[in-house]
A protein has these predicted regions:
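Membrane-interface junctions of multi-pass transporters
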Residues: 180, 205-247
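A C-terminal junction/extension of Radical SAM enzymes
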Residues: 128-208, 247
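Structured core elements
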Residues: 49, 90, 118, 182, ...
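Flexible, active-site-proximal loop/turn residues at the rims of small-molecule/cofactor binding pockets
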Residues: 52, 123, 244, 248
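Short, charged, surface-exposed secondary-structure boundary motifs
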Residues: 56-60, 127-128, 211
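Radical SAM/AdoMet-radical enzyme domain recognition
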Residues: 2-122
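Residues at the C-termini of beta-strands that transition into short coil/loop
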Residues: 50, 121, 167, 202, ...
Length: 248
């Protein structure tokens, strides 16, 4: 499916004076040399999904027989990152209530030889035992501070790494769209389901309230699109007068 979509996209580029940038996310299980070669040729960026240290990843991502996936996927990811010259990829982790010490996971990625990484908070039903609660926020903020100190320390030692959420250009800032809204959901970003349904973002898939349309009909629910357009820094009282509103 991926190969067919890329081929189809490439066939449209010249006639429409466009250049597609494709990105692939993989959990690594089916990753092999052929897929790596294809991605290195066609994918502008790849996301290597690894939930954290061995014990964290294997707790959240076991195989059906209960065994962990860490030992299978990490060597593949290391090989893949090297094949891309340690550029144009991210090792993406997820922190939950099980690993609020997620700085250790990012540091672990660096110790494995990865140079491009990201760590995102889990989105989960509040009833799940791993769901993040409001009471966890102070600990999470402290953890970002701890990670920042280690980040600076390693940069000074000549063994630095890139952490996606610390990459802020204070001189130029991000593009105008990101400065205004931060998120492109429903305006410059769409999620397409295997059935062709269009949603503002993958987080909304399955929530019929946010169904925008279909690949056959195009966007028909323009009210939702307009609602997302109005979500910007000037519409948020806590943001509109903040000095960091265009960098946050």
């Amino acid at each position: 499916v991926v190969k067919q979509l890329v081929e189809y996209g490439r066939s449209l580029e010249e006639a429409n004076h466009k250049k597609f940038r494709f990105t692939l996310t993989t959990n690594g299980v089916l990753l092999n040399d052929e897929i790596m070669e294809f991605c290195n040729h066609e994918m502008s960026n790849v996301v290597l999904s690894l939930d954290g240290r061995r014990e964290i990843n294997d707790k959240m991502r076991p195989f059906r027989n209960g065994s962990g996936s860490y030992d299978m996927i990490v060597p593949k990811f290391q090989k893949f990152a090297e094949s891309r010259g340690q550029k144009n990829y991210y090792v993406r982790g997820t922190f939950t209530r099980n690993n609020l010490d997620f700085a250790d996971d990012v540091i672990h990625y660096a110790d494995l030889g990865f140079q491009q990484m990201s760590m995102e908070p889990v989105v989960a039903d509040p009833s799940e035992d791993y769901a993040i609660k409001e009471e966890d926020i102070p600990a999470i903020l402290k953890e970002y501070d701890r990670l920042a100190l280690e980040y600076i320390k390693r940069k000074k030692e000549g063994r630095g790494f890139n952490f996606f959420h610390f990459m802020l250009d204070l001189k130029a800032g991000p593009c105008v769209a990101k400065r205004m809204a931060g998120c492109g959901s429903g305006t410059e970003y769409l999620a397409v389901t295997p059935w062709g349904d269009l949603y503002p973002c993958h987080q909304f898939v399955g929530n019929e309230k946010f169904l925008l349309g279909n690949v056959d009909t195009g966007i028909v629910n323009t009210d939702i699109r307009d609602e997302f357009k109005s979500c910007n820094v000037y519409a948020k009282p806590g943001c509109k007068d903040c000095f960091a509103r265009f960098y946050c």
